Regions:
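Short, glycine-anchored, charge-dense loop/turn motifs used at functional sites
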Residues: 25-30
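An amphipathic alpha-helix signature
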Residues: 18, 60-67, 87, 91, ...
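Acyl-donor (CoA/ACP) binding surface of acyl/acetyltransferases
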Residues: 43-74, 104, 108-220
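Single conserved hydrophobic/aromatic residue that forms the stacking wall/gate
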Residues: 1-6, 10
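A short, aromatic/hydrophobic, helix- or strand-capping loop or linear motif
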Residues: 11-12, 78-83, 103-109
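Short beta->alpha transition motifs characteristic of CBS
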Residues: 14, 21, 32-38, 120-123, ...
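A short helix-loop-beta-strand connector motif used in the catalytic cores of GNAT acetyltransferases and
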Residues: 16-18, 94-108
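Conserved GNAT-fold acetyl-CoA-binding loop/helix
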Residues: 74-96
């Protein structure tokens, strides 16, 4: 028999999809795991494995783990979004952003599958080049200083350049977010300047963005 699992293309049918399908030698389906559409990751989201991490699509089952991370003001205030107040708020973020958004992953530890952060690549809104992307990420404060984010960023850069065919990947962070700056510099990003008054946050504060970029031929 042959099986198709999380790393394969999901087969959609009706209001959901087959997450895992077992076929007999003639290709007939003999066993499957079916999930509703809201739990289905967008087409093209692949599982990425590193030495210590598994980057996988988000599901609604991640609601509590996302809330546990994102209720921390030290995380949200460094990333530009309001700290989560309720599980319902975290679920809404999952349903409207993390789950439907292509090339967005939950960062989980291999050792215990604990969700510790998020990472993704989006089209760069500041550049007209369709082969330019923008990377964004956050990490649970309890996991800071362990090298997890550098490991995840390295894997997603490889995916962006070599799987998506991007020629440039950018990143922005607040001037006070020194940890994010160190990650980008470690990965070989070049600092290209300050975009002044770039963002009005949820609490009506105006922030500058430090802007970085990395071209494919400079990937470490």
């Amino acid at each position: 028999v042959r099986s198709r699992g999380l790393g394969d293309v999901y087969k959609r049918q009706g209001d959901g999809y087959f997450e895992s399908v077992i076929l007999d030698p003639d290709g007939n389906r003999i066993e499957c795991v079916y999930k509703k559409e809201q739990e289905c990751p967008p087409e093209g989201n692949h599982v990425i494995e590193t030495e210590r991490l598994i980057l996988r699509p988000f599901t609604e089952n991640d609601t509590e783990a996302v809330f546990n991370c994102c209720q921390n003001p030290n995380l949200g205030n460094n990333a530009g979004w309001k700290p989560h107040d309720t599980l319902e708020e975290s679920l809404k973020i999952l349903q409207t952003i993390f789950i439907p958004q292509k090339d967005t992953w939950a960062i989980t530890r291999k050792e215990d599958r604990l969700l510790i952060g998020a990472i993704g690549i989006l089209p760069d809104p500041k550049r007209e080049n369709s082969n330019a992307g923008m990377i964004g990420y956050w990490l649970d404060e309890a996991q800071w200083g362990k090298g997890y984010m550098s490991e995840a960023v390295c894997a997603v850069l490889d995916y962006g350049f070599n799987k998506l065919g991007l020629t440039l990947i950018s990143a922005n962070c607040y001037p006070q977010n020194k940890r994010s700056q160190r990650v980008l510099e470690k990965m070989g990003f070049t600092y290209e300047g300050i975009l002044h008054q770039a963002e009005v946050s949820y609490d009506d504060k105006i922030y500058d963005h430090l802007c970085y970029y990395l071209e494919k031929n400079n990937l470490k």
